[in-house]
Every structure is written in C-alpha cells, then in structure tokens.
C-alpha cells in the first residue's frame, strides 16, 4: 500500500501501473497492487520552467548621433475614389530594413497634426502617400512601384573617423543582441517575426526590400449552420448507436457501409471529428505521438499534457451527444426498437476519451491518479444511447493498423493494443457489474463499507459470477485509488455520478474476427444483436436537425481528404 501522503496521487508513477500476465479475460486486473509507492526520482529538470527573460533596461552607452537628413516616410492612406474594404482598421507602423547595406531605419508612427488632418490623411491599405511632404499631391504616389515606394537613405559620411564608429540603430546593438529602444520597440517585438535572418545579425536580412503582406485566411469548407432555424421539426423514432473499440477494429468501415447501403431516410451517420482534432488550434494526434516518444512516465508535465489532449478528444464527442439529446422531443417516451425505426450511428463516444484511454495512460504510468479521477468525473451519458463495442484479435488488429499506415499510429505496438482492448473490457465489466448490483451496493463495496460476499448474499447473485466480473472490471482500480479518500464527499459524488451515468448506457459486444472481408455479415450481426436486446430503446428525435449535423460533419471530413 502507498503512504498516506496526498502528493502520491498528484504525481504520475515512474513505471507501469501494473503489468498483467496477459490481456485475456481470465487475467485482467487480478492480484494487482495499484498503490505501490514508486521510487522518488531526483530528476526534476524537465518539470522546471525556464526563467523569463528580463526586460532590457537600455542603459548601454549610445554612440554619437549625426545630424538627421530630412526624409519622407511612406504611409498608407485611403483613396476616396477607391475605398478599401479595410476602412475600419488602423494599421500599426511597420519596421523595415532598408535595401542599402549598412543602413537601417524604422517607419515612424503617424502624427496627427493640423496639416495632416486638413488634407484628410488616414491609415489604410489601398494606396500609399508620403507623410512630411506637404507640398506634394498625396494621390500622385498611388501607383508607385515597389522600388520607388521607400526613399533612399543617404550613405554615411565619408569622414574616416565615422568609419570607426558604425551607425547606431534605433535598437542599440550590444553584446551580440539588439536592445530595444523604449520608444519605438517596447511594444512591438512580434514585428520581427517576418524577417528571414536572425535578430542577432540584422544586417544580413534577406527580405529587406519586401513589402509586408497581409495574410489572408484559408478558405473554409462550406457548411450548414446547425444553430439556425431549420424549419418545422420532423420527429421520428430512432435508435442512437455509438461505435466503439480499438483503432482499426472496423468501426469506420461499418459506418461507411451503413451510409452507402441505407438512405438518409433510414440512417444518418456521423464520422469522427478528425478536423477538430487535427486543424482547430492544435493537432492533438501529433501531440500524442510526441508525448509517447519524448515524455517519460512519472513527470508532472507529462500528465498535464495528456489531460489537455484527452479534453480535446472529448470536447466534440460531448457536444455531439448533447446535440442529439437536444433533438429529442420533450415528454416523449422511449420504446423498444423495431425493424421500421431509423438509425443514428456515431463514430466514437465520450466513453473512450474520458474513461478508457485515460485508464490505459494511468496504467502505463503516464497519467496521475488525480487527473484520471478528474477526467472520470466529467463523463456523462444519456438515456437511449447504445455502445456497440467492436473487437478483433490482437494480431488481426495490429495488421490492419499497420496496413492503413497513419503517421499518428506508428508508435502503437501489440502490447498497446492489448492494453486498449483490456481497458474497453474493464469498462464493459464495470457496466455489467452495475446490471447485477444497485449503485448503492456498488458504492459500499468500492468504499470498503461492505464486502462482495455480503453483497451477493443480499442481492441473490452467484458469488462466482460476481467475483469474475468484479476482478475483470475497472471497479477494482477505482476502489484502490479512492481507498484513502473515501470519506470525502466530493469523491463520493464523483463515484456515484460515474456509476449513474455508466448504468444509463446499453452495450452490445460484436466480435468481428469471424467477419473478415465480410462487411455485410458484420452489419447483420450488429443488427440482430440490437433487435434481440429488449433493453435497447428508441427515442423520438428531430431527424431534420440531426441530418444537418451529419451533413456538416461529412462535408468537414471530406475536406481533409
């Protein structure tokens, strides 16, 4: 057993949580001491954040300044004849390296004066006018070439004494670095990002004469807003099924078969939200690959990154489930599924993102007990949701995984597939245990207030069956994790809520190993299991709203191909 220190649950283990003999049904989670105290590592360098760089004070000695040569600065203006679409923007002045070797200048910010105001000067991106030359017509510079757009700065004086003292920049160069001028560069360090050379040597900039260009946003795929009024709702009885299982188990293949075989009036399918995972803000799949390659078990930074990844995996899955729940007609009753009912098939449920994969990561020592418990508390399910758990043997699964050759799955080996299959089986056994025992009885067993023998005697359940299910379920792991904190009411609420949400689901288990290259046969097996299960119910749902969601999801998914 672990010590009584609470810090043991905030730090991930530095070794595998447990190493089962094999990921077979007879050996899952048996004789495992989950709270073995790991050896404390003195290596903390990876968790220490680098100290922020201090602000430059600018106390370095400045060279003698030579008399300034009057010059006009190029500034954009708004042409009255050709109004720009960016009229409302006031663009910040750009810093620019001149094309002349050894010369460096900054574009001064505009100064609002009476002469400028009277002539109607303002900032825009339609054309350019020269500020500081009041005698010239502003519109005469609208069509200047790129070479004529910036003035030439005269070279340094030919005095030999000046050659020994190089020209000082607005940002003083000292000790191999640029020290920002308090007035011009204090709030604009990000402007240097467009330069192709290093800031340590600004005189070697290769894009000195290039005009700064505005980045245009990439074209987004067309979509149907799911939040707009879609007209009169069209309510039908539909069975909501979520395909779950290990990667390359056949979920997407079966979903595409249903989409191609059945019409939109019979079945609607929602694919994986791959675009959100890979293109919105960050690529979470690449992050997972990087963590598995570089991060070490037992590091706080590792578990923090994994929590961030799992939350991003769970976000679209939770919102899809909530959208389907909002589509249910109020005060409608669920009824047993029939041959003429509609289908709503979704690839992945939040069960995998918040329960199964966090369980795998915790067992591998990558995720701390505390973070696993927090993710568990975010899980939720709704009445009428069905989990179709699909599986194939490990060797076939590994062969399929390598055949499709995704970059984000190169780090997955046979042992990892076994662990994922075992975690899905552990979650299923936990649900199965709740079908034999009430939530209150399960809580008492997990909190150590009652034994399994007493629960079997009270509920009238065979002890052999209950013991086998209990030992293969994730409830053994959960009871060991919360054993030292079972008297905390928040821990009790999280466990009670998790058991309540998990018991709401309905499961069907489909072994696809017997249906290799037989997708219609696999669909027939799934269909028959759903029809024979009297506990699976349909919900009265707005099929028009769900179709808008499904079409948007498929259009977004197709834009990635």
From Swiss-Prot:
Residues 1-22, 34-122 are annotated as: Disordered. Its EC number is 2.7.1.21. GO terms for biological process: DNA biosynthetic process; TMP biosynthetic process. It holds the Pfam family Herpes_TK_C. Homodimer. ATP binds at residues 245-252, 400. It is an enzyme of class 2 (transferase). SUPFAM superfamilies: P-loop containing nucleoside triphosphate hydrolases. The active site is at 272 (proton acceptor). Keywords: ATP-binding, DNA synthesis, Early protein, Kinase, Nucleotide-binding, Transferase. It catalyses: thymidine + ATP = dTMP + ADP + H(+). It comes from the Viruses. Residues 1-14, 112-122 have a biased composition (Polar residues). Catalyzes the transfer of the gamma-phospho group of ATP to thymidine to generate dTMP in the salvage pathway of pyrimidine synthesis. The dTMP serves as a substrate for DNA polymerase during viral DNA replication. Allows the virus to be reactivated and to grow in non-proliferative cells lacking a high concentration of phosphorylated nucleic acid precursors. Substrate binds at residues 310, 406. One of its GO terms (molecular function) is thymidine kinase activity. Gene3D superfamilies: P-loop containing nucleotide triphosphate hydrolases. This is Thymidine kinase. Belongs to the herpesviridae thymidine kinase family.
């Amino acid at each position: 057993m672990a010590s009584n220190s609470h810090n043991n649950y905030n730090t991930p283990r530095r070794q595998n949580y447990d190493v089962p003999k094999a990921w077979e049904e007879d050996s899952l989670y048996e004789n495992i001491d989950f709270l073995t105290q790991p050896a404390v590592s003195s290596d903390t360098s990876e968790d220490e954040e680098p100290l922020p760089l201090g602000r430059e004070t600018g106390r370095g000695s400045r060279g003698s300044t030579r008399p300034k040569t009057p010059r006009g600065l190029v500034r954009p203006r708004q042409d009255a004849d050709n109004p720009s679409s960016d009229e409302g923007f006031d663009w910040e002045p750009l810093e620019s390296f001149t094309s002349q070797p050894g010369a460096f200048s900054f574009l001064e910010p505009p100064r609002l004066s009476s002469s400028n105001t009277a002539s109607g000067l303002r900032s825009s991106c339609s054309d350019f006018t020269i500020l500081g030359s009041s005698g010239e017509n502003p519109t005469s510079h609208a069509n200047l070439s790129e070479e004529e757009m910036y003035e030439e700065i005269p070279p340094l004086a030919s005095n030999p004494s000046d050659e020994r003292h190089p020209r000082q920049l607005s940002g003083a160069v000292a000790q191999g670095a640029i020290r920002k001028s308090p007035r011009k560069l204090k709030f604009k360090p990000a402007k240097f990002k467009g330069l192709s050379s290093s800031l340590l040597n600004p005189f070697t900039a290769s894009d000195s004469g290039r005009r700064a260009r505005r980045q245009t946003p990439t074209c987004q795929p067309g979509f149907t807003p799911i939040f707009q009024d879609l007209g009169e709702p069209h309510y039908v009885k539909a069975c909501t099924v979520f395909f779950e299982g290990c990667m390359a188990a056949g979920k997407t293949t079966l979903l595409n078969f249903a989409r191609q075989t059945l019409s939109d009036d019979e079945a609607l399918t929602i694919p994986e939200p791959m675009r959100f995972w890979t293109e919105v803000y960050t690529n979470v799949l690449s992050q997972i690959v990087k963590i598995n390659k570089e991060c070490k078990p037992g590091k706080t930074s590792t578990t923090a990154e994994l929590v961030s990844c799992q939350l991003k995996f769970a976000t679209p899955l939770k919102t899809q489930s909530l959208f389907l729940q909002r589509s249910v007609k109020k005060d409608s009753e669920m009824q047993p599924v029939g041959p003429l009912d509609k289908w709503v098939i979704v690839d992945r449920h939040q069960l995998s993102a918040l329960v199964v994969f966090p369980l795998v990561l915790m067992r591998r020592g990558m995720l701390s007990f505390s973070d696993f418990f927090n993710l568990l508390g975010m899980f939720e399910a709704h009445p009428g949701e069905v989990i179709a758990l699909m599986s194939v043997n490990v060797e076939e699964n590994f062969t399929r995984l390598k055949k499709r050759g995704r970059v984000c799955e190169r780090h997955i080996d046979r042992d990892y597939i076994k662990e994922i299959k075992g975690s899905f089986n552990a979650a299923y056994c936990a649900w199965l245990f709740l079908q034999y025992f009430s939530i209150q009885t399960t809580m008492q067993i997990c909190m150590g207030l009652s034994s399994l023998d007493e629960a079997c005697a009270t509920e009238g359940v065979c002890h052999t069956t209950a013991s086998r299910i209990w030992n293969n379920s994730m409830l053994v792991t959960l009871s060991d994790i919360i054993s030292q904190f079972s008297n905390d009411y928040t821990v009790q609420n999280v466990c009670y809520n998790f058991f309540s949400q998990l018991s709401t689901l309905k499961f069907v288990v489909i072994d696809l190993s017997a249906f290799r290259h037989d997708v219609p046969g696999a669909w027939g097996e799934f269909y028959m299991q759903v029809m024979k299960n009297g506990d699976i119910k349909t919900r009265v749902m707005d099929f028009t709203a769900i179709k808008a969601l499904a079409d948007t999801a498929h259009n977004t998914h197709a834009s990635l191909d």
